[in-house]
């Protein structure tokens, strides 16, 4: 009797588990500074969803006009830590109207996709919208640039430095030449 009930239990659990909606993108926009319209927020949530699905990471767009930390990096890092926890996959784009700065914070696998150079490139492109006061365009650019870098993959020669311990972790990416050599060695 128990052997027949166990598969039924798992079938019911699986059925209801798959029926629950994914709401990761639902909490992705925190517009405390009220820079975006409700329609713009909904559109950004839709644009964020494919990025979150591909990277298995949370993506956040946060606006504030009351930075209690006095530093955009500290504000963004604490926000991310409170939302997802330490070393979980996430990226955050902060528009800080209090300090008049923008910042991108990464955690988990997003550190590998969004290197410092890629973040700088993204922030340069975001500044076009920011300088015109078009915060929606700036947020869209952030999502589009992040998605483009994710599509390119983790760059070769990438490494991480743990800010607490100073430990360096290098990541090896197999080049096309190495793939050909490995394939030739396998068939030869």
Regions found by a protein language model. Give the residues of each.
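Sec-dependent N-terminal signal peptides of Gram-positive bacterial secreted proteins and lipoproteins
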Residues: 2-24
């Amino acid at each position: 009797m128990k052997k027949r009930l166990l598969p039924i239990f798992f079938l019911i659990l699986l059925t209801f588990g798959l029926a629950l909606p994914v709401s990761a993108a639902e909490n992705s926009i925190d517009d405390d500074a009220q820079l975006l319209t409700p329609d713009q927020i909904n559109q950004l949530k839709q644009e964020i969803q494919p990025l979150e699905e591909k990277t298995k990471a949370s993506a956040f767009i946060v606006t504030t006009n009351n930075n209690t930390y006095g530093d955009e990096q500290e504000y963004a890092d604490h926000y991310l830590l409170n939302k997802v926890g330490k070393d979980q996959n996430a990226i955050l784009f902060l528009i800080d109207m209090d300090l008049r700065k923008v910042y991108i914070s990464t955690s988990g696998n997003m550190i590998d996709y969004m290197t410092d150079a890629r973040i700088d490139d993204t922030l340069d492109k975001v500044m076009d919208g920011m300088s015109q006061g078009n915060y929606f365009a700036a947020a869209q650019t952030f999502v589009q640039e992040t998605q483009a870098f994710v599509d390119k993959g983790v760059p070769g020669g990438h490494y991480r430095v743990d800010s607490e311990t100073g430990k360096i972790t290098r990541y090896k990416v197999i080049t096309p030449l190495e793939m050909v050599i490995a394939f030739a060695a396998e068939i030869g």
